[in-house]
Regions:
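N- or domain-start disorder-to-order transition segments that initiate the globular core
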Residues: 23-54
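Short internal beta-strands
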Residues: 87-95
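Solvent-exposed, acidic/flexible segments
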Residues: 40, 44, 65-72, 99, ...
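Solvent-exposed loop/turn segments at secondary-structure junctions
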Residues: 62-66, 94-98, 149-153
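A substrate-binding/cap region within the structured catalytic cores of diverse enzymes
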Residues: 100-155
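Bacterial N-terminal signal peptides that target proteins for export
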Residues: 1-11
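Hydrophobic h-region of N-terminal signal peptides that target proteins for export
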Residues: 15-23
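An N-terminal structural lobe/cap that precedes and organizes the functional/catalytic core
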Residues: 47-84
Length: 155
């Protein structure tokens, strides 16, 4: 009985694998495409190899695009795997006058609830930016709030 179940399970797994492979080959629509400086399409590994070389990397984004936020998160994870404690992050989604609050949260001196209450977080922070900050916190990656304070930006 167990052999029959195992055989059927393996057969089903094989069929699913073939189906997934076929889907990936034909009907798959990518969420993004990467290009190098010459406009040639490149893969993610090539991107990370290029981004791992310079001392500073700037990533532009559309603030309400969850795909770019996810890609930033994945790039951060990949660069951390290469650089470990040499990595430092900065993000425009946090204003410079929130640096103390951010530092307190990152060092676990205050809770997430207090951080959320005191920092002026963007509406999409919890869905688009929190995973990025949480990854930095868990891995003790220094994080700089790089945006100009709102009171000056609104002048």
């Amino acid at each position: 009985m167990n052999n029959l179940f195992f055989s059927r399970f393996c057969g089903l797994l094989l069929l699913c694998s073939i189906g997934v492979a076929a889907f990936a080959q034909k009907g798959y629509k990518r969420a993004y495409t990467l290009f190098n400086a010459e406009g040639k399409e490149i893969g993610y590994d090539e991107l990370i190899e290029a981004l791992a070389q310079p001392d500073v990397v700037f990533i532009g984004e559309i603030h309400n695009c969850c795909i770019t936020h996810w890609l930033e998160y994945e790039i951060t994870r990949s660069l951390y795997a290469i650089h470990k404690e040499k990595l430092m992050l900065g993000a425009e989604m946090l204003e410079a006058d929130n640096q103390l609050i951010l530092d307190e949260y990152m060092s676990r001196a205050i809770s997430y609830d207090r951080f959320e209450a005191e920092a002026r977080l963007w509406d999409n922070y919890s869905t688009d930016y929190a995973p990025f900050v949480f990854f930095a916190k868990e891995n003790k990656i220094p994080f700089i709030a790089t945006n100009v304070p709102r009171r000056y930006a609104n002048v």
